[in-house]
């Protein structure tokens, strides 16, 4: 009996290594702060092949979804759903942007040149190719975090009160607004101002419903202005 209990505990620990356990304090979505100073259009990033710097101002008038991604995470399957989301909502002005990061459980260990082949042949595999732009691997938290992520995080409250298990988080210093895990999402409106932030466990179907609801509100406001 003792051995069975020990094995059960070990299994739980191993499974926990792939994805942080859910907490009662988690919220699926948070609305961003009003009166934010600046816009995302002040920033930009290098594409995953390092060949092009894309200024985010090229997305003026678009709804832009920022996602920090990883190839060896329990949530890597979200890539398939994100492709579907991009395809479905692109006609309405949605643009997805993916930012590989290795700060959560060391789940994006490869070089930039290895990430797309890994997605194609390993996880999700089956010839998968993202239909949205991926950028160079970089930090989203800590001393060397990318500046646009500083802007996004300062614009939106966190979706969880707790950061998680410190031995699986690889950055310093840790701050209350930090991203908690792979596949957190931020939506930026057509004016470049952050609108919503989603917990990494929030389903893509719920993210889609939230985005569509926001798009409808924006459309209604546009009609009223006319």
UniProtKB/Swiss-Prot annotation:
Keyword Oxidoreductase: yes
A GO-annotated cellular component: extracellular space
Family annotation (PROSITE patterns): GLUTATHIONE_PEROXID_1 (PS00460), GLUTATHIONE_PEROXID_2 (PS00763), GLUTATHIONE_PEROXID_3 (PS51355)
Keywords annotated in UniProt: Oxidoreductase, Peroxidase, Secreted, Selenocysteine, Signal
Signal peptide, first to last residue: 1-24
Alphabetized CDD domains for the sequence: GSH_Peroxidase
Molecular function per GO: glutathione peroxidase activity; identical protein binding; selenium binding
Subcellular location: Secreted
Keyword DNA repair: no
Tissues in which the protein is found: Expressed intensively in the kidney and adrenal gland, and weakly in the cerebellum, heart, and lung. Secreted in plasma.
Major location (coarse): secreted
UniProt-listed GO biological process terms: hydrogen peroxide catabolic process; response to oxidative stress
Active-site residue list: 73
Superkingdom of the source species: Eukaryota
Pfam families per UniProt: GSHPx
Job of this protein: Protects cells and enzymes from oxidative damage, by catalyzing the reduction of hydrogen peroxide, lipid peroxides and organic hydroperoxide, by glutathione.
Similarity field: Belongs to the glutathione peroxidase family.
Assembly with partners or alone: Homotetramer.
Name listed for the protein in its UniProt record: Glutathione peroxidase 3
Species in which this protein is naturally found: Macaca fuscata fuscata (Japanese macaque)
Name of the coding gene: GPX3
